[in-house]
Curated annotation (Swiss-Prot):
HAMAP family per the UniProt record, alphabetical: RibP_PPkinase_B
Gene coding for it: prs
Cofactor: Mg(2+)
Lineage: Bacteria, Pseudomonadati, Pseudomonadota, Gammaproteobacteria, Pseudomonadales
Keywords: ATP-binding, Cytoplasm, Kinase, Magnesium, Metal-binding, Nucleotide biosynthesis, Nucleotide-binding, Transferase
UniProt source species: Pseudomonas putida (strain ATCC 47054 / DSM 6125 / CFBP 8728 / NCIMB 11950 / KT2440)
Family designation: Belongs to the ribose-phosphate pyrophosphokinase family. Class I subfamily.
Protein name as catalogued: Ribose-phosphate pyrophosphokinase
Length: 313
């Protein structure tokens, strides 16, 4: 523990402060700003030679600025002789561009970012609820992907919901939703979205009986909130008594807050992997949980060369 040092950029300093409080160590001193032309500038204000350095920096909006802060900081620590550099990226931006669809001339941006982080000398990466698990394979360095589900499950249990059912908002999220349902010992529902004909709106098929149930939609992130709001509407139309949504990453871009406020969703519960905007904080239907204890425990285990997977057994 004596060699561990934790630093942060400007992406989510509040989370970093919460993590170091859990670890009972001070937050490292680094200055991260911009030159007059907008270039990122960074300077480490204390000795890091031989230290086990952790940089807490989600690559949320402004995505490119936060990514460049992480890259430039990592280079500064490498040139300052840190013994090991771990990038703690609670929310990994560019994760949605992880494949090249057939006949599409697009970049695989997740791979580009993985290469950038590796080439600047980062030794390992710690993420929370990667959008696609296969992104770990884009790196040539160790990647530990931990889960936000324990925090979400604990809160669900504390709420003492009656007649509870976990629902996946789409087919792609079934594995995640099934794991939460299994942890809670409750039923699983699935929403199957399909477009019956071209130029026709999507039809939502509900797999499972939601009549009179308290339904909880589970997903890794909420972006514009369109999927969750449409899912909540479909569930209510099929007789659900209450509909809540639990998501790890509150990206909440575009008209997300407006969509949530106009929806029939009773509450959206998120973690603090991404800081909430002022509008999100003012929305009485959004509640934020603290994921710092989970991140701090993972950091401690990495520093002490202990098992990460043992956290989730």
């Amino acid at each position: 523990m004596s060699k561990m040092m934790v630093f942060t950029g400007n992406a989510n300093p509040d989370l970093a402060r919460r993590v170091v409080r859990q670890l009972h160590i001070p937050l490292g001193d680094v200055s991260v700003g911009k030159f007059s032309d907008g270039e990122i500038s960074t300077e480490i204000n204390e000795n890091v030679r031989g230290k086990d350095v952790f940089i807490i920096q989600p690559t949320c909006a402004p995505t490119n600025d936060n990514l460049m802060e992480l890259v430039v900081m990592a280079d500064a620590f490498r040139r300052s002789s840190a013994s090991r550099i771990t990038a703690v990226i609670p929310y990994f931006g560019y994760a949605r561009q992880d494949r090249r669809p057939r006949s599409a001339r697009v970049a695989i941006s997740a791979k580009v970012v993985a290469d950038m982080l590796t080439v600047v000398g980062i030794d390992r990466v710690l993420t929370v609820d990667l959008h696609a698990d296969q992104i770990q394979g884009f790196f040539d360095i160790p990647v530990d992907n931990i889960y936000g589900s324990p925090v979400l499950v604990d809160d669900i249990e504390d709420q003492r919901f009656e007649n509870l059912m976990i629902v996946s908002p789409d087919i792609g999220g079934v594995v995640r939703a099934r794991a939460v349902a299994k942890s809670l010992g409750v039923d699983l529902g699935i929403i199957d979205k399909r477009r019956e004909k071209a130029n026709h709106s999507e039809v939502m098929h509900i797999i499972g009986d939601v009549e009179g149930r308290t339904c909880i939609l589970v997903d890794d992130m909420v972006d514009t909130a369109g999927t969750l709001c449409h899912a909540a509407k479909a569930l209510k139309e099929h007789g659900a008594a209450k509909v809540y949504a639990y998501c790890t990453h509150p990206v909440l871009s575009g008209r997300a807050i407006e969509n949530i406020e106009k929806s029939v969703l009773d509450e959206l519960v998120v973690t603090n992997t991404v800081p909430l905007s002022a509008a999100a904080q003012a929305c009485d239907r959004i509640r934020q949980l603290d994921i710092a204890p989970v991140v701090a425990e993972a950091v401690r285990r990495i520093s002490n060369e202990e098992s990460i997977s043992a956290m989730f057994r």
